[in-house]
Amino acid sequence: MVYSYSEKKRIRKDFGKRPQVLEIPYLLSIQLDSFKKFIDLDVDGQHGLEAAFRSVFPIKSYSGNAELQYVSYRLGEPVFDVKECQIRGVTFSAPLRVKLRLVLFDREAAPGTVKDIKEQEVYMGEIPLMTENGTFVINGTERVIVSQLHRSPGVFFDHDKGKTHSSGKVLYNARVIPYRGSWLDFEFDPKDNLYVRIDRRRKLPATIMLRALEIPTEEILGMFFEKNQVRIDGNRFMSDIVPDRLRGETAQFDILDSDGNVLVEAGRRISARHTRALEKAGIVELEVPAEYLVGRVFACDYVDQETGELVVAANDLLTLENVLALKEAGYTTFETLYINELDHGAYISDTLRIDSSTNRLEALVEIYRMMRPGEPPTKDAAETLFTNLFFSEDRYDLSSVGRMKFNRRLGRETSIGAGTLDKDDIVDVMKQLITIRDGKDDVDDIDHLGNRRIRSVGEMAENQFRVGLVRVERAVKERLSLGDLDAVMPQDLINAKPISAAVKEFFGSSQLSQFMDQNNPLSEVTDKRRISALGPGGLTRERAGFEVRDVHPTHYGRVCPIETPEGPNIGLINSLASFARTNDFGFLETPYRKIVDGVVTDEIDYLSAIEEGQFSIAQANVVLDETGRLADDLIPCRHRGETTLKESSEITYMDVSPQQIVSIAASIIPFLEHDDANRALMGANMQRQAVPTLIADKPLVGTGMEKTVAVDSGVTVVAKRGGRVDYVDASRIVIKVNEEETVAGEAGIDIYNLTKYTRSNQNTCINQRPTCNVGEPIVAGDVLADGPSTDLGELALGQNMRIAFMPWNGYNFEDSILISERVAMEDRFTTIHIQELSCVARDTKLGPEEISSDIPNVGESALGKLDESGVVYIGAEVKGGDILVGKVTPKGETQLTPEEKLLRAIFGEKASDVKDTSLRVPNSVRGTVIDVQVFTRDGVEKDKRALEIEGMQLRQVKKDLSDEFNILADGIFARAKNLLIKSGIEESRLESAQREKWFDLTLTDEDAQTELDQIAEQFVEIKADFDKKFEIKRRKITQGDDLQPGVLKIVKVYLAVKRQIQPGDKMAGRHGNKGVISTIKPVEDMPYDVNGTPVDIVLNPLGVPSRMNIGQILETHLGMAAHGIGVKIDRMLKEHEEMAKLRSFLKEVYGAGTTHQEVDLDNFSDDEITRLADNLRKGVPMATPVFDGATEAEIKHMLTLADLPESGQIALFDGRTGREFERPVTVGYMYMLKLNHLVDDKMHARSTGSYSLVTQQPLGGKAQFGGQRFGEMEVWALEAYGAAYTLQEMLTVKSDDVNGRTKMYKNIVDGDHRMEPGMPESFNVLLKEIRSLGINIELEEQ
């Protein structure tokens, strides 16, 4: 493999056995592609805004005299960029402008004659835009729209599993689900009649639907039944015989062949053997007794030819009288329906009998009554309602997906068709349902991923936009119908409010629009790749059963079987598998390598769950020979959801990668294959809660996915083009782009600005640090700067800690964790949290609130950290209770006592008519002020601090832009200088002249002169561009802010809080091994090894066997080897070993084990080898990909390389006594995470606080400043101790005895420490509840 200069800095040793066939697709593509589809112009009008407009326009007036047509749309430029939107608390969006055409028709002239056409561009609200990382900024906060997994439109056949009827009979049903419109259900009842329901309302006989479609009874029977013909021959009845149709019936008479031999005896059931004998004998007609025919059903109407009278109607039951009447009417043959209890039920025939309607109108009226009970039906209303239900494009749409699924399920050739239903569709669904009822087909599996599809951002936004447009459509129609339209323009017809409201509501408060989890890069990526079955049009937690939540065979490679939340949402919220993507229809697809005649090709096909069923698919770890042929004769493979063994010639596909079945979070757990699934689930979920530490530390044992996550998450800065690093500081990186990658006529400079100390959604700190140095060569895709939780472009969620598995005085009982003081002292798990506190000054009824440092009744010391505007200084260290922003609010006039009047007369007015409502630091917080933002309403005078901040921002912007300009100008002048020197001008003369004067020189060579003119033009352009950019920025900074009504000023203060690790904090490994820190012990008390190296963390060995997460042990061993090799390299560097020796040792390390990785260290220069070795001093990072990782032998080999015992266990000594422990202990390096469950956020004590209204007991929880619950069991404990008085005060004055606690407070004030308990309020609540049951209880005084 060829490594770039940056990649050579640190190379991860990979234990993967299989080469990567397919790169992992861009992780955020599900979000970005979907939204791009929504926003981009779609010529076909199938997707996005274009589709929404085309589905609603043109809007015609009721009279048909006017029509509003859609022409095109365009999105404007957003006013603020993403960062500005976050600071100002506004939505990152672009204005939508739509070109509409109003066409007026001439009433007097011929229909369709155009009188007037007006075209105009109309503003239709703002459309939120997606940032380049797949998020939306709504009201200043980053949000993610989670994709939804919903039931695909189409037709589904199911049964009730025998739960509906007491007999336990299985009742089958069919459901036609459109993308939008009414649901259509067909279902059987216990008597085998077929019913129809529309939108889950009252059921009607299904044949009403057929009658409403104008199908006569005879035709209905013809569609659903085969016919038997009977010939009347004198007094004999000759029935046509199809031997197959007799199977299962009981012979009521002997059936003889032409020779008189008995083929079937009377009373015998006719079996397949009998039917074969009948076929062989060639019997096509049999004489049958009249009784045999009685009870059969007539297939058609029979009319007396002479009188025209109906003799027998279709679907009548055959009686002897009927047959005689037919005979008298001159009929010699008649047809009956072929009905057979076994596999040709009489369902439709029976249903027709209970159907009260006889013609189309009656059927329509019946449907109207069911849909609109209580309204009088008219013919037109009934027809309109029925047509609108399933046959109108405005009201009903199956969508292309629905039509494809519908046709495919009914076995049709084509997968395209109309979005509405037609007669054939409804009949075919009923036929298919009857086929299933007859046992000739199976019901559908609704949890199959072929029946569930993904709705992503773009599609959901389009639907919401359409909802807004439909609201507008109604208003436009009414407006078009009102009188004179000659003076009306399209602008006057459209009100953009409903559209904006629909879109805003979706992005702001829809169930699927979630506050982005921004704990660390992994949690961001996972949030964007999440798939939820909840949300509008989806399931609800309460109704979802086990089947929906369970892992389904079709999840393989599409949805991760591991990563899902614990708790009520388990299985309803899933994560996309690593290689999965959605196809055009929204179904999940996963890639497979094609196999032809047992040979694996490089061709890769993406298959959806629907297509996958018919193939036999081998796993990724199948053995191949050198030619790429399947080596074994029998191969384990998946076929139709089952795992079977098949011959190699039958195998059609194989997996792309062993990690294709798991999600991103699960694929960064090393040795995942050795962990129990439940613990792996916890491990995957807990990685998302890891807080970024002060100094990120790459995992020594990883899986090789760390780089992908770090780069795709967007937290790092990645080079867009190759070049050389020209300039680096903490906030900016400048790259001089390679000549071959620049476009003709551009400056060839790329500038990357870094994010510094910004607050994330979870209050963690986002900060980027450059990883490159000036002069280094860069390739496109190289990581230039690390973000939070990344180290040299690799994900680094935690720290590598030296751990020992051993008990230590009970301090690691029940998953507790014992850590060394060194961990805290070295700030290994110190994290920075940034809190935003805001103070709002409003205009009140009594006058405006003021932000000032003149606050009543506050001493000088409390105002020491405020400036004269009343806002805290940046850099001030504050603690709980300190004032951050001084604010006073006017208070109402109160009646003053004479003393107060006197004081006011002497000391002036001010102090008494305002109250102090300053913003103070919350009690449990202490930190440093790192930033202050002041927002002032337009028209309100800015205070001194606001002007200072404004001036500072302007200076910063000017500096940034002029730096940018200078860098670009330098590039331009460098090109001009080269050109002039080539043209023969001396360098010294150029140096002495002003640079801008160079462009005035005239050259003899025409081509050179043209090029110089071009360069001069470019210079003028970038100068003008600089002025323009600065003016735009200046206007943005100096203009007033658009604040909510009644708000005059907002001050936002940002506090940085540094949190060291402490007892009570939660920590975890990557294998679901979580625990809480019990205590921090001095370094000298910790167990140490022979060399005197103490361990950092002591874990309980009993946490491993029952949890079955052995991955942590293997990680510990491999981590020990990785660190040991690092120590060896460090020693070599310190002892200045020969380069050849160092190189050969590194070769041995990277070449160990059977691996596909090829690191050609011979191509590395000595400097590169030294730099690589320098970065490996703390340990050689290793990758053990999931399901393809390091074997036990390889781990042992690495331990040997590090000169460590193969067992991975070493002798430890007790730090307190110096004695050796009884037996060797497993010691190694494990990657530990600090989770966002910090004791500082949970610690809480109540003094006095609020009480619940009903029970009068203290509220619960930190947010409510609540008390500690003293529950039932705690009461038992005090009872057991006999602590009667303690118990009494717990149940009365400390809880809900209102009078008692008031008296006690009074007593304490008086210095009298007694309590008089009264009646607890909860007793009164109990009395009231008993009274509500109708039992009166009263307390009588003795």
Swiss-Prot record:
Q: What start and end residues bound the annotated signal peptide?
A: none
Q: Could you tell me which InterPro entries the record lists for this protein?
A: DNA-dir_RNA_pol_bsu_ext_1_sf (IPR042107), DNA-dir_RNA_pol_bsu_external_1 (IPR019462), DNA-dir_RNA_pol_su2 (IPR015712), DNA-dir_RNAP_su2_dom (IPR007120), DNA-dir_RNAP_su2_hyb_sf (IPR037033), RNA_pol_bsu_bac (IPR010243), RNA_pol_bsu_CS (IPR007121), RNA_pol_bsu_protrusion (IPR007644)
User: What UniProt keywords are attached to this protein's entry?
Assistant: DNA-directed RNA polymerase, Nucleotidyltransferase, Transcription, Transferase
What the entry lists under CDD domains is as follows: RNA_pol_B_RPB2
The catalytic activity of this protein is classed by the Enzyme Commission as 2.7.7.6
Q: Name one GO biological process term.
A: DNA-templated transcription
**Per the record's keyword annotation, is Nucleotidyltransferase included, yes or no?**
yes
User: Any one cellular component term from GO for this entry?
Assistant: DNA-directed RNA polymerase complex
The main enzyme category here is: transferase
The record lists the catalysed reaction(s) as: RNA(n) + a ribonucleoside 5'-triphosphate = RNA(n+1) + diphosphate
Molecular function, one GO term: DNA-directed RNA polymerase activity
Pfam families from the entry? RNA_pol_Rpb2_1 (PF04563), RNA_pol_Rpb2_2 (PF04561), RNA_pol_Rpb2_3 (PF04565), RNA_pol_Rpb2_45 (PF10385), RNA_pol_Rpb2_6 (PF00562), RNA_pol_Rpb2_7 (PF04560)
Q: Which residues form a coiled coil?
A: none
Function noted in UniProt: DNA-dependent RNA polymerase catalyzes the transcription of DNA into RNA using the four ribonucleoside triphosphates as substrates.
Self-association and partners:
The RNAP catalytic core consists of 2 alpha, 1 beta, 1 beta' and 1 omega subunit. When a sigma factor is associated with the core the holoenzyme is formed, which can initiate transcription.
Q: Which family does it belong to?
A: Belongs to the RNA polymerase beta chain family.
User: What protein name is recorded for this chain?
Assistant: DNA-directed RNA polymerase subunit beta
As recorded in Swiss-Prot or TrEMBL, the protein's gene is named rpoB
